[in-house]
Amino acid sequence: MDITKIVDKYFRPFVASAAAIFLIPWVLYLELVLPTHYEAYHWRGAWVGFDVGLVVFLAATAILGFLRSHLLSIAAFATGVLLLVDVWFDIMTASPHDRPTSIITGVCGNIPLALILMGIGIQIGRRIYQLAEKATLDIEHDL
């Protein structure tokens, strides 16, 4: 059996599964030991840096879309995930006074855009898989 097939079939899913399983105790540990209130340092840099990264991913997604690149599937999905992370932290770190605004902007802006981008990524990924599968069948048929 080809080593690439072994890695694809067994190793990659095992690594992701193991990481997910080992992360569970870590999350429980954090729930027990982290304070409910913490004064963050470099707050501005963290938020500005994250949003700059989000702009880069949005721009890359747009450029890859204009280029009709197969990499659009990955960029669109990743950008959608970043938008969901942005909403989560906007809401969780907002003061009680600002929380309604964070929820409204998340529900009306970030979440719909994230779902659209992730849907685009999934659709393109499925189509690429279908085309690759068809090409494999065509090659096998020609042999």
What do these predicted ranges mean?
Residues 51, 73-91, 110-116:
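Hydrophobic alpha-helical membrane segments
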Residues 39-48, 97-109:
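Non-cytosolic membrane-interface motifs at loop->transmembrane helix junctions
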Residues 28-37, 88-97:
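Juxtamembrane "helix-exit" motif on the non-cytosolic side of transmembrane helices
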Residues 1-20:
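Cytosolic juxtamembrane helix and N-cap/initiation of the first transmembrane helix
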Residues 21, 45-63, 78-85:
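Core segments of alpha-helical transmembrane spans in multipass integral membrane proteins
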Residues 111-136:
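Membrane-water interface at the C-terminal end of transmembrane alpha helices
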Residues 6-12, 33-43:
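Short juxtamembrane and helix-loop transition motifs at transmembrane-helix boundaries
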Residues 59-73:
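Juxtamembrane helix-break-helix junctions at the cytosolic face
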